[in-house]
């Protein structure tokens, strides 16, 4: 591998490429277009059969770290032994950090993350040209980045998103913040939470929305300012607890019982698939509900174009997991599809009730059903909300503008970057 003549930004990801993390591949592509040299370190390979088209345009090299200890013990141990012999003091310091973090919660993942970091530093870093490590997600990628920073002497930073914030051990996350050069997060709600957790620390915590590439979401100006039965209702979501799809299904059932003619299309897949499909059958929604699984971008676009309403029932999961601002809300709004969702986490930073959408309390199917019907049937509301929502996304959440703020943060970290 040829070492870049420019300082390289190392991006540490949990998996690459991942269709559910298109916002990360878009960020990398936009940074490259601004002149950044990027190298990707991924903790595992992508598991979907297709990817977003932006991935094909990314020039960054990719190194995949050994994913599991049992199947990769020789490679992990060999490269860690080489590193320990080459840099004994740094390796001893890294072991001390790993031991301290392990003793807090006895999580064996701490050892795996440390060994992955040793592999990264010994096997991957020397030929990469990387001068700064940035991890996407505050849990395992940031753990590997922290250890790699101690073992290599390179600074690290991370972007905190949603689940990685609210399901992480508070003491472990605070230590990551303390040792990082800076932290980025994607909502003001998250930033306030992290600032409280990091009280007394000097690490800068920046709020930069992900946004979307608004050029990829067009419907030819055919906005559905009026809708008529049978209404087409759409959700695009991973099938996990925090998305609140059971609440949506119960709301659809209530509307059906009230004689409202509609069809409901659900795009996405996830660990709760069996539960959700069983609930569809239990509620007798098979005649009006279609589940399509994970779909590529062009298929999702076609469903946006046909939809009269986009709905999500976001809620806090039992383990504390929650959404920030789901990217599908940006997508729906810029496509001219009005949204009804819940007043949870950072969603009100995008959706203003009566102005750019409608919000209801989480876990309330009856309230969700009422809001859905209002947005479907009230032509005046639709005529106000649809253009205002689209304008809000175009003005404040275009990722081509937002990536400039990220670039301003990364540049000082890449000493000598021009």
Task: Describe each PLM feature range.
Residues 169-171, 195, 212-229, 415:
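Acidic anion/phosphate-binding donor-loop and adjacent secondary structure
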Residues 189, 211:
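Carbohydrate-associated surface elements
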Residues 224-243, 249-252:
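Conserved donor-binding/catalytic core segment of Leloir-type glycosyltransferases
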Residues 275-298:
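Nucleotide-activated donor-binding/catalytic signature segment of Leloir-type glycosyltransferases, i.e.
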Residues 288, 367, 374, 381-408, ...:
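A short, well-ordered alpha-helix in the C-terminal region of glycosyltransferases
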Residues 305-320, 337:
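Acidic donor-binding loop of glycosyltransferase active sites
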Residues 329, 334, 338-341, 351:
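Short hydrophobic beta-strand element within catalytic cores of glycosyltransferases
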Residues 350-354, 358-365, 374-380:
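Conserved acidic donor-binding segment of nucleotide-sugar-dependent glycosyltransferases
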């Amino acid at each position: 591998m040829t070492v870049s003549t420019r300082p390289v930004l190392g991006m540490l990801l949990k998996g690459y490429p991942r269709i559910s993390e298109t916002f990360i591949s878009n960020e990398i592509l936009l940074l490259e277009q601004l002149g950044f040299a990027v190298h990707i370190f991924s903790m595992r390979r992508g598991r979907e059969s297709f990817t977003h088209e932006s991935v094909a345009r990314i020039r960054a090299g990719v190194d995949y770290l050994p994913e599991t200890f049992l199947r990769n013990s020789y490679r992990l141990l060999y490269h860690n032994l080489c590193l320990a012999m080459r840099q004994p003091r740094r390796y001893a310091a890294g072991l001390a950090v790993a031991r301290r973090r392990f003793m807090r919660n006895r999580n064996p993942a701490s050892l795996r993350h440390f060994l992955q970091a040793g592999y990264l530093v010994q096997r991957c870093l020397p030929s990469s040209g990387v001068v700064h490590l940035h991890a996407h997600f505050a849990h395992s990628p940031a753990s590997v980045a922290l250890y790699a920073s101690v073992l290599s002497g390179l600074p690290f930073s991370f972007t905190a998103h949603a689940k990685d914030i609210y399901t992480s051990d508070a003491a472990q996350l605070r230590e990551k913040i303390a040792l990082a050069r800076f932290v980025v997060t994607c909502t003001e709600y998250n930033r306030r939470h992290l600032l409280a957790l990091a009280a007394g620390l000097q690490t800068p915590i920046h709020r930069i929305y992900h946004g979307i590439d608004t050029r990829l979401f067009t419907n030819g100006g055919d906005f559905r300012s009026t809708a008529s039965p049978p209404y087409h209702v759409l959700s695009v979501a991973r099938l996990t607890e925090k998305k609140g799809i059971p609440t949506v299904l119960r709301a659809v059932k209530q509307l059906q019982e009230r004689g409202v003619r509609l069809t409901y299309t659900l795009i996405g897949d996830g660990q709760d698939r069996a539960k959700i499909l069983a609930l569809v059958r239990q509620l007798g929604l098979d005649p009006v509900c279609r589940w399509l699984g994970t779909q590529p971008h062009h298929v999702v676009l076609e469903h946006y174009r046909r939809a009269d309403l986009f709905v999500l029932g976001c809620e806090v999961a039992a383990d504390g997991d929650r959404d920030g601002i789901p990217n599908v809300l940006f997508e729906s709004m810029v496509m001219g599809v009005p949204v009804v969702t819940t007043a949870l986490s950072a969603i009100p930073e995008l959706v203003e009730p009566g102005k750019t959408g409608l919000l209801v309390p989480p876990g309330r199917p009856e309230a969700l059903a009422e809001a859905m019907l209002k947005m479907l049937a009230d032509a005046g509301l639709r005529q106000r909300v649809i253009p205002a929502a689209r304008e809000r996304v175009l003005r404040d959440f275009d990722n081509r503008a937002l990536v400039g703020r990220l670039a301003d943060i990364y540049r000082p970290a890449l000493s000598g970057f021009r």
